[in-house]
Amino acid sequence: MSSLRDFQARHDLSMEALCARILERHAATIRVKKPAVAIANLARIVETTLTLANRKGFHSTSLRDLTEQSGLSMGALYAYFDSKDTLLMMILGQVVGVVEEVLGRPPDGLANDPAGRLRWLLRTHLFLTETMHPWFVFAYMEAKSFPKEGRDLAVTSEMMTEGMIADALADGVTRGLFAVPEVTMAAALIKPMLQDWYVKRAKHRRRGITPDLYAEQLIAFVEAAVGLRRT
C-alpha cells in the first residue's frame, strides 16, 4: 500500500459498510429487523449526527435536531438507540473497532522489518483518518464531553495505537535500527502529528498538502527523529 487510493481500494469504509458493522455489533438492541432498512437509516442517523456535532457540538445537539435534519421520527430514532449516550457509544465503538481491525493487522512480511512496520503504521493511520475524517474529528473534538465509558474507550484506543508504534520502535532499537532512549515517550510524541492531519486538515489543504504528501513528509521526519540507520 503506497497511496490513499490503494488504501481505499483495499478497505471498504463507506458509510453504509460502517453502519452495517454497527448493526452487527448492536443487533440485540436495534429493533429494526430488515438489514437493508436498518443500515440505510443508521447511515442517515450517523451522517446527520456527525454533521450536527461538527456544526454545534454533540452536547448541544438534541434528538429533536436529529429528527429534523435526518427526516426520521422520534419513534424511528428510538428503534436504534435509547439515548444520546448510546448513540455516541455506537459511533465511538465503530471508530475504535476499525482502528483495531485496520492497524492491528500489519502485513506478514513486516513482522521482521520494524522500519517498514513503522512506515506502514504511520501511513495507514493517516489514510484511515482521511477516509473516515468526520468520525475521527467527532471522536477527538467531543472527547471532553464523553461519559466515563466513552472516555475510557477513547483512552484505551489511543493507548493501543501508541503501543503499536512503541512496539515497532522497540523492535527497531533491539535490532540496532533506531536510536530512541524512551520508546513510549517517542510514540506519545508521534501520535499528535498523526492527529494534526485530521484536526487541522483545512490548514494543510490551503497549503496544497495532500494525504500522500503528508504521509511521506511525516515518515521522513519520524525516521530522522528516531535515528533510522539505513542498511
Residues covered by each model-derived region:
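An amphipathic alpha-helix adjacent to DNA-recognition modules
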Residues: A43-E47, H59, Y80-G104, E162
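Amphipathic C-terminal alpha-helical segment
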Residues: F127-T131, D167, D171, A187-I209, ...
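Hydrophobic alpha-helical connector segments
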Residues: R105-P134, A187-I190, A215
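Helix-turn-helix
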Residues: L52-T86
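N-terminal intrinsically disordered/low-complexity leader segments
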Residues: M1-A38, T231
